[in-house]
């Protein structure tokens, strides 16, 4: 179910403050965040946001194709070790 257009996209307050400050200072340092639920907004384009995946912060470089998606979509939480070979006798 989509979010109402009347409400607008959800972005944690502390994250949007850091984004606006980084844009004002032209700071290229990655912004660390645990907020996987925040939506990528146009103000984030060109910045690098380090999204926590449960273990480490994964650096995500934001481009215009990511607008409207959630930050958590770009930081994979599970590691796939691969399927083992054929074990049939």
Swiss-Prot record:
One of its GO terms (biological process) is ribosomal small subunit assembly. GO terms for cellular component: cytoplasm; small ribosomal subunit. Keywords: Ribonucleoprotein, Ribosomal protein, RNA-binding, rRNA-binding. Disulfide bonds: none annotated. GO terms for molecular function: rRNA binding; structural constituent of ribosome. It holds the Pfam family Ribosomal_S19. InterPro entries: Ribosomal_uS19 (IPR002222), Ribosomal_uS19_bac-type (IPR005732), Ribosomal_uS19_CS (IPR020934), Ribosomal_uS19_SF (IPR023575). HAMAP family: Ribosomal_uS19 (MF_00531). Protein S19 forms a complex with S13 that binds strongly to the 16S ribosomal RNA. Belongs to the universal ribosomal protein uS19 family. This is Small ribosomal subunit protein uS19. It comes from Vesicomyosocius okutanii subsp. Calyptogena okutanii (strain HA).
């Amino acid at each position: 179910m989509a979010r109402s257009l009347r409400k607008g996209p959800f972005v944690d307050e502390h994250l949007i403050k850091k984004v606006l400050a980084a844009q004002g200072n032209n700071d290229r340092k990655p912004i660390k965040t645990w907020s996987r639920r925040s939506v990528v907004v146009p103000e984030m384009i060109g910045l690098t946001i380090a999204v926590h995946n449960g273990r480490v912060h994964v650096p995500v470089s934001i481009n215009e194709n990511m607008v409207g998606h959630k930050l958590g979509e770009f930081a994979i939480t599970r590691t796939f070790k691969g399927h083992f070979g054929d074990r049939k006798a």
